[in-house]
């Protein structure tokens, strides 16, 4: 899950095979989007934020309940450009964490953006294009194109970010080892 208050990326990926021959299959990818109805309000919480949080929370719960994943990776928040955007990021992360914790008793891990990028691409500062290319190469890219049909290119990056965490080989190794027990 790539959390946020404007865009939340979700990728459900099946990890199969035996180490080191790991296969990744896209099950579902979505981007849930909201925007304020009344413009910027100086960083205060209002009824409009409650509407947005409620929509994103129920959307995440729905995906988690539908697929019942063995492991949920939740991207940690990273630096923000302003106090307002930092507050929005914190709200988005908190709502995603609450949705995960209330919908499942399975394992959930928080993944730092820098660590995920370094493990997946070899570079902590990997750009959006490199992340997208890695995910398409490792997970069936055609399926991503189909799943995200109608989603603006600028918003697709959130689904790719969510997939990046699961498409890491170290995460796959842990999942496969646990299933073998």
Segments (PLM) and residue ranges:
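Phosphate- and other anionic-substrate recognition elements at nucleic-acid/protein interfaces
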Residues: 1-181
């Amino acid at each position: 899950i790539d959390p946020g208050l404007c865009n939340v990326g979700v990728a459900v990926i099946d990890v199969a095979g035996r180490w080191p021959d790991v296969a990744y299959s896209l099950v579902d990818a979505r981007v849930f989007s909201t925007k304020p109805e009344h413009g910027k309000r100086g960083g205060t919480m209002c009824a409009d934020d409650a509407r947005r949080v409620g929509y994103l929370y129920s959307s995440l719960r729905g995906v988690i309940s539908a697929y019942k994943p063995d492991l949920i990776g939740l991207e940690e928040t990273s630096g923000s450009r302003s106090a307002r955007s930092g507050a929005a990021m914190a709200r988005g992360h908190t709502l995603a964490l609450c949705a995960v914790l209330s919908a499942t008793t399975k394992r959930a891990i928080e993944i730092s953006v820098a660590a995920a990028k370094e493990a997946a691409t070899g570079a902590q500062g990997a750009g959006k294009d490199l992340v997208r290319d890695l995910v398409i190469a490792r997970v069936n890219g055609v399926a991503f194109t189909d799943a995200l049909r109608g989603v603006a290119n600028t918003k697709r990056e959130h689904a790719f970010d969510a997939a990046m965490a699961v498409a890491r080989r170290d995460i796959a190794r842990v999942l496969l080892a646990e299933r073998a027990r």
